[in-house]
Each structure stands twice: as C-alpha cells, then as structure tokens.
Amino acid sequence: MKNSSSMLKGVKSFIGSGIYTNKPIYDVAIVGGGIVGLATGRELLKRNPKLKIVILEKENEIAPHQSSHNSGVIHCGIYYKPGSLRAKLCTKGSKLMYDYCNENQINYENCGKLIVATKKEEFQQLEQLYKRGIENGVPNIKLLESKEQLLSIEPFINGGLRAIHTPSTGIIDYKEVSKSFGNDITEKFGKDSKSEIKLNFNAKNFKYNSNDKLLLISTGDDDDDEEQQQSILTKYSIVCGGMNSDRIAKVAYGNDEPSIVPFRGSFLQFKPEFRHLIKGNVYPLPNASFPFLGVHFTKRINGEVWLGPNAVLSFDREGYKFTDFNLHDTIDLIKNPGLFKLAKKHWKYGLGELYRDFNKDHFIQLLKPYMPNITVDMLEYGGSGVRSQAISKSGDLIEDFIFDTPSDVPIIHVRNSPSPAATSSLAIAIEIVDLAQNNFKNLNSL
C-alpha cells in the first residue's frame, strides 16, 4: 500500500478556502454509478436516511457499462468455491434480487438453467459441480441423469446426455434494476437528506485533509485550475469504479494491485423465427482454467436468445466493437507484467477466442455439441460487453471480490467485483456498508 500519511502532507485546509466555501459537504461520496455503487448508496440510506449521499458517475447516465452490457442472468451460485465471497454473496444476493423485484414491480422470469454434459467423460465433473451447488445452498438444484429428463426441460438440446437443473436461475434487465436503485437514493430513502446523483463527474483527484477530516474529490489534475473543475467535499468515500477501479485506487490512496485487464465478449443471437429453440439458459461445464463460463445459450427478458460470449482481450476498456481502440488502455496492457505471464500460458486459447470473434461458423462449433442441427443461417450478430478481470503481477486471474481499506484515509475501494456482481449487488452492498460502519469512525452517529 502507498504511504498515505506522506501523501496527506501539504494539503491545505479546505475550510475557509474561498474556492470551497460554498461547496456542499456530503457524508458519503460513492464513486461509480454502476449497479454496485447504486446498491451501496441505497443500503447506506436504508439504514440511515439522514445521511447526505452523492453518487459520482463519469458518464451521462447511470449503469452505462458492465451493469447494462451483460447477459442479464440472475445467477444461482453453483459455480463458486464454497466459503468464498462469490458463493456466499451470490446465493444471498439472488434471493434479495428476487425479493426486491417483487416489491418494486420489476419484470423478471424464473426460466431456470441447465448445465449440460455432452459426453460420458464429463459425468464426474458434472457430479462434482452438483455437490458444490448443494454445499453452496443453491435452492431446488437437481441432477438429471437421463437424456429424457434433460429434453423435458429443453427439447432441442438433443446433444446433451446429463445435466444439472437450477430452477432458481432467472433473467432480468439490470439497467432497469439500476434505475430503481437510483430512484431509491434520490426519492425513496434520500429525498429528505437531499442525496443526489451527479452525472458527467469524472473523479480524477482525491485529497484528504486530516485536520478538516474531509476528502476533496475533483475532476481535474493537480495542475488544472481548481476554479474550472467540478469538486465536492465528503467525510467518507466508497469507490465502486468497476473497469477503472485500479486507476482510481492509484490516485486515491489505494493499493497498486490488482490491476484490471478488460475482456470483450461478443454474442450471436437467434433470428426471431428460431428463438423457440431455447426455453431458458443452457450452459456448458466450466473450464477450470478460466473464470468465464464459456459460450452458452441465454434467453433474454425481451424475448431474444443470445449465444456466447467469447472472451477477447480488449484494447479499449469501454469499447464494444472489434475495431475499438484506446491508446491509454493499450499502453496499460503493454506495461502490465501479469498480462504477459497470462498470455504465455494461454495464448492458444486466446487465438481461438479471437478467431471466433469474426467467424460465425467457428463460433457455433462450440454450440453444436448441445444443438447439433444449429446452423449459421439461424443466427445474426447480437450485443457485446466488456468484463473487468483483476489480475496479479504473477499473471494469476483473481476470482473473488476484493475490498481495499487504506488505514489513514476514510475510503473503501471495491477492487474486484466480477460476475455475478449484478446478481449479488444487494448482498455486496450489505457487505460494503457493514465494512464502512466498522471502518468509518463516527459514520453510525451521523
């Protein structure tokens, strides 16, 4: 961790400074208006509606990136290592998400999921995954030991031999959930305290004054004219920076590791006349070497059926097309020692994913074991998303949630929030606010 004590030296008092005299002072500033940041703001206000909260989002809308560019699945928690935060928060978060949607009239569908074995050699792995699901408390999970049982749920997955059925898996539009969380902050829980969401606020600079016990967050760099910047003062801050969590940590008293590597995932989709071929979600058995769930069939809440995604290294953290390129993001990739170690181990896998990105026929070869009659003519290009993957300097992919809490500054950094973060968002928020109440002196008395 950086020596935050030395970083605090030389920061002038904010109180009485002409530039900041009229600035509102917030109790908590949450950096990042994605689903995790919004859920965290909601949870803070739910516990204490007197808090004055601000959400700082750099784009012109909330939940613009990972929170809305995803497959829209409410995951059940089967995949994750028992005892891990991912397992605990997904199982808990799934129930909380369904309860929240019922209370707030948000549309979802409990369509279920099959995890399918297509050859006998996969039966042992399927049984092990089933046992993991039991251990993680996945509700109503069932091992389907015959093809007939499988076909009774997904009649066109005639390449499958056995499967796990998780009826608690669902589909939803997380953008709508995020909007509802935002309304909870500004209206339901935070109206009296005048809590708010500030858009187009790109938090770049963080200065903490230990005498004032205030943190200045601004949109400019140190050498920019302070009067030309947007800035706010806050007693505490929680950073839910998603794809930019590593960059924000570097300028906001956080640890240097882990770094973020972006992976773009592209989807195909069934043409409308073929959507009936899938009733819910159909997944392969996961590859133990990677945190991604493989190419799968996903029913969408709007009726579409997506196939994918692949996982291709992205040269633009917020670019959703094959041709998107950002020089800053690319330089960060080149300078990342962990990425080169990862690429050395898995370059063949990476080339295969890249080829699938622009070759439909190669893409569907991964789907034919499940649906042998699928053809390119049934498909068209669908959406895409970019996933933030935390990586260590040794090239290891970091799979669990990470919270970074500098000792001298009242900030919490959410450093890694991989899938199923959207499913788990309400449970993650509880975890973060519990941490804040333990770490932020006087928060409970505000």
Curated annotation (Swiss-Prot):
Keywords: FAD, Flavoprotein, Mitochondrion, Oxidoreductase, Transit peptide
UniProt cofactor(s): FAD
Similarity comment text for this entry: Belongs to the L2HGDH family.
A GO MF term: 2-hydroxyglutarate dehydrogenase activity
Protein name: L-2-hydroxyglutarate dehydrogenase, mitochondrial
Organism superkingdom: Eukaryota
E.C. number(s) listed in UniProt: 1.1.99.2
PANTHER family for this protein: L-2-HYDROXYGLUTARATE DEHYDROGENASE, MITOCHONDRIAL (PTHR43104:SF2)
SUPFAM superfamilies: FAD/NAD(P)-binding domain (SSF51905)
Gene Ontology cellular-component annotations: mitochondrion
Reaction equation(s) it catalyzes: (S)-2-hydroxyglutarate + A = 2-oxoglutarate + AH2
